[in-house]
Amino acid sequence: MTKFIFVTGGVVSSLGKGITAASLAAVLEARGVNVTMTKMDPYINVDPGTMSPFQHGEVFVTEDGAETDLDLGYYERFLRHSKMSKSNNFTSGRIYQNVLNKERRGEYLGGTVQVIPHITDEIKSKILASGEGYDVAIIEIGGTVGDIESLPFMEAVRQMQVELGRHRAMLMHLTLVPYIASAGETKTKPTQHSVKELRSIGLQPDILICRSDHHISPDNRRKIALFTNVEERAVIMCEDAQSIYQIPRTLHEQDLDDLICERFGLDLPEADLSDWDKVVEAQLNPESTVTVAMVGKYVELPDAYKSINEALLHAGITHKVDVKIDYIDAERLEDDDSLLAQLHNADAILVPGGFGERGTMGKIKAITYARENKVPYLGICLGMQLAVIEYARNVLHIDANSSEFDRKTAEPIIGLITEWLDERGELQIRSDDSDLGGTMRLGAQQAELVAGSKLAQIYGATNITERHRHRYEMNNRYIEPLEQAGMTISGYSAKQHLVESVELADHPWFVAVQFHPEFTSSPRGGHPLFNSFVKAAKNYSEAK
């Protein structure tokens, strides 16, 4: 039967619950445990699909087309054998929506619908369903202990601990042990109060993960254990690390996996973390450095491009290259030519996905620079659409645009997808008036690459599967004039013949794709497209 480890956070947000939980999952997986992970988000949005990247960061897309929290990206990157799906992320909004739909159908037989038991029962059913078929399920609860929004989730966890018993449920709590510079010491009181807050709602942590930017002394560890009623060996020190991929080793060296296996009655071999050691060794000991200019409109918050950042890091690990990302505000680039110096200093240029017209002229400016100066260029999603628009305007000399930016454009080289088949093979129909949430081409889709194209050479195959998140596509009636002018259409969707990729034959490395390759990159091997891109950047740097 599935065992559950619930993960909560206290004192402050952004402690790294997702990374810590994923690191623990990686260690358990290295011991042969079949493990999965789920993120519970207390906000009322049904999913993060329409949330501002400035507030929420990246939206991570799963194979089955779910728009989810960026922590699911960490889960997939740390785990070898588990892929996330719609069942691995749910919000308060989704829970309430499900309960209200049941009430409308009369499933509660006219009863008064309440937070307890109806909302908590729905949460419990989702948790249990997400763990089916696995040895261990790690359940991360978003937010911070004490937040009013998370109380129904905390109550559901409390009930599950009682119902499942000690041998099937554990609670792991992350907390901050701050260092007070003026006093020259770390302070345990915030951790004590965080656990006190948990205990006030009926939850006692079995494991404490103590986050700090300074060393925590053995005396403070004993003090934390004494005043939080947690075994001393279950008080785990987790200081800031040079690489997040060091965390599995950090947890393992403090015997956290042994403690969990003992509690759950799991007799398993020792964890083999040699793969993680190799990743860390390559990351911390690069042999060269390249700079990638990322031109976007959410660059003030790097988490908005978390999977791309990680994919570039993974490619750097693969080639033993330190990939430095120089973020350029696309909107500022439109009018500030001084920012062109950053493009000049870059070894490669990347334009990521995005929505809306704001900043597009700055991105087009960067694409023109990359094309004319033979700088390696990678366009993703909107980055491909703008590469097509740039080429049409500056090479074909037509006033091309996207109907997303100008519905009345005379040359709609990019247009709204009105019909397509989703990941289940079901017909989806959209219009300009459709809801924004959940109305895109989402999830894993098959594509066919043109034999002999650069992209086919990069993948080593002509049939690939990549994840998508977009509602606009290239207009196929422009394929012939573009190809006659020198742009190669190198990939098409397998069923609808939608354009998936373009490239330039007279450019050392100019590739743009409609899909999102960053979602499937791994620290153990990277992703073929990003690996090739970083290699091209390295070659460009060496040839300067």
Curated annotation (Swiss-Prot):
ATP binds at S14, L15, G16, K17, G18, I19, D71. The active site is at C381 (nucleophile), H516, E518. One of its GO terms (cellular component) is cytosol. The keyword Heme does not apply. CTP binds at S13, D147, I148, E149, K187, T188, K189, P190, T191, Q192, K223. The keyword 4Fe-4S does not apply. Residues 291-543 form the Glutamine amidotransferase type-1 domain. CDD domains: CTPS_N, GATase1_CTP_Synthase. Mg(2+) binds at D71, E140. UTP binds at S13, K187, T188, K189, P190, T191, Q192, K223. One of its GO terms (molecular function) is identical protein binding. One of its GO terms (biological process) is pyrimidine nucleobase biosynthetic process. Disulfide bonds: none annotated. PANTHER family: CTP SYNTHASE, CTP SYNTHASE-RELATED. CTPSs have evolved a hybrid strategy for distinguishing between UTP and CTP. The overlapping regions of the product feedback inhibitory and substrate sites recognize a common feature in both compounds, the triphosphate moiety. To differentiate isosteric substrate and product pyrimidine rings, an additional pocket far from the expected kinase/ligase catalytic site, specifically recognizes the cytosine and ribose portions of the product inhibitor. HAMAP family: PyrG (MF_01227). This is CTP synthase. It comes from Psychrobacter arcticus (strain DSM 17307 / VKM B-2377 / 273-4).
